[in-house]
Every structure is written in structure tokens, then in C-alpha cells.
Amino acid sequence: MSRVRYNNSVALPATQTVIKQNEDGLLTIQKDFPLPEIRSDRLLVRVEYVAINPCDWKMSERFPAPGAVDGCDFAGTVVALGSDVSKTGRFQVGEKVCGGVHGSNPIDPTTGSFAEYLSADAEFTFKVPGYMGLKEAAAVGGTGIGTMGLALSKSLGLPGSPTRPVGETDSKYVLVPIAVCSPKNYDLVKSYGAVKAFDYHSPTCAQDIRAYTKNRLAHIIDPIVEAKTMQLCYAAMGRAGGKYCALEAYADELCTRKVVKPELVMGMAILGRKVALNHGYGSEADAGKRAFGIEWYREMQDLLDAGRLMTHPVRVVPGRFDGIMKGLQMLKTKQVSGEKLIVQLGSNN
């Protein structure tokens, strides 16, 4: 195989293996795909591990983008620096990093994590701390972190910040996190900080939540956004209403209470770049969101360095690219609960 060399880089292959959308929008493995371009504000990363998210199978089905590489969350090794990144001295070739990219992107089709090499925005890439392995770093990723940044701070408008939570900055606010999940995951969500968990299978789940919150629940994030989850969320919201943050597009006819204000959040908008998706998911470039996102990621880096950013329990799926295809099907058919699927692509631990 021929090899090429970028500025500030090690010797690299001319082509790589990726999972991309074919001409019909279906995900397929291609073994002779070119390496992505190294833009001035980017890092070229050799991917060692990837995490699989529900959006990874949904993107190709809902937003066909023939030729686009799929996948978002990754961990790996820096092998080349963009010219602007090189000047800052913030990253070095050989460093271990993790983050999230916009996979299946019709505007930037080579930027997806299901690849041996990817191009990552340096401002939205974490340095992996010494105590953490790359397998766990892939579970940190960046997709969920970016989504929660927009959901908590922008959509719900919660006070405080990740490193200065409410209570430390303003005694007027008391935020009590609760969760809705399967009973088998009660201990897991409580270990992450939920003070109370409720069984979504229970026919009295909404009433139980209203009783526990004294009918004052005012902020809800719904990551599933199906008819039954929206009905539960709207029924559980307190008498005075509040903000409902949907991580999927919602049906207007299910917005049954005027005092509840719904909003759709698309996590990749935090990059500040145009999101060229339809069905309500798209957005124009937004410098304000990018500035917020950069600050949010810097705070997350501080939490990561301090060991205060927890990941889901990891479940490794073997088989490299075949393993990714298997993992996507596992998520699509709802075979995964309370775990993050991870696939090893490289040789590092």
C-alpha cells in the first residue's frame, strides 16, 4: 500500500477501511476509502476504539447521504495536526484523544468515526487523562456531552455550570435529578446522581413522579421521543408546566399542555457549523453556539481530568468493522440496556 505524509505527521496509508452509506443510503464496509483532508483547525486521528450510538443507525435510514462515512464517538491517537492547531501547541502528534464528530454528514462526508482515520475539530476534542484507557475514553466520546450541553444550558436554561453547579453559586436554586428507567437499572442511575428512579413500565409512573416532586417538576429531557414517552413526560410535568427538551423530532399533536414548552435539540449543532438535515433537525451555522460549545468542552475536560466524568458500563463487541455492523443491529433491535457498545479498531489498549 502506498503511503503519504502530511505536515506535522507520521507516515500514513493512502487509503483506509470505513463504514459509509452506499448509493442507496445503506451502510456498507469499504476498504479503499481515501483519508480525510486535514483542515487548519483539525486533527487527524488514528481511530483505536469507537462507541456506537442510536443515531449511528438512524442517520442512514432517515437522512440518506450516499458516500458519507457514518459514526460519531471515538478514541485514538493524533497522527497529524492542522496548521492552526500546530501553532497553538495544545495538541501533539502521538497524544491520546477522544471526542465526537458529525457522522453521515452530507456537507462533510469524510468526517465519520467508523473509519481507521478521522478528522476532528480540535476545539471539540478531549485529551485522554492518564488514568483512563482508550476503551473507556471512547465511551466518553463527545456526542452525548455536546447534546447535554445544549439540552441543559440552552434548551432547559438551567442555572450554574458543570464545574460550578447550583447550590454552590446561588442558594435560591435547588435542582433534584430524577430518572425514569427499567427497575434493573435503578442502581446504575442512582450511582450517577439520580436521587430517585421510577419504573416506566408502571401504569402509575406519571402520578408517582408528580407525588414525589409535589407537582413541581419543571424540566424534562426525553431522549426517546415516542408517543408513550411524550405522554409520560407531559403527564409528569408539574401543574405550572415547564420545559420539555426532546432529543428526537416530536409530533405537535402530542404537545397536549400549553404550559409545557417543547424544544428539539440536535447535539451536533454545538459545533456551530451548518447542520444540513431535514425533518426539523437542520440548522444554520451559529457562532454563538460554537462559542458556548468551546467553553462547555473546556469545562468537561476539567471534569474528565479530575475523574468526575462517569461513563456507561462498557460492552465490547468484537470483529472490528463487522462488529460495528453487528452493534448497530443490536441497538436497532433494542438488545442493549444500561451499556455502551464499544468496538476496537486499532491495536492500542
Curated annotation (Swiss-Prot):
It comes from the Eukaryota. InterPro entries: ADH-like_N, GroES-like_sf, NAD(P)-bd_dom_sf, PKS_ER, Trans-enoyl_RdTase-like. NADP(+) binds at residues 55-58, 182-185, 200, 247-248, 336-337. Its EC number is 1.-.-.-. Disulfide bonds: none annotated. Pfam families: ADH_N (PF08240). This is Trans-enoyl reductase phmE.
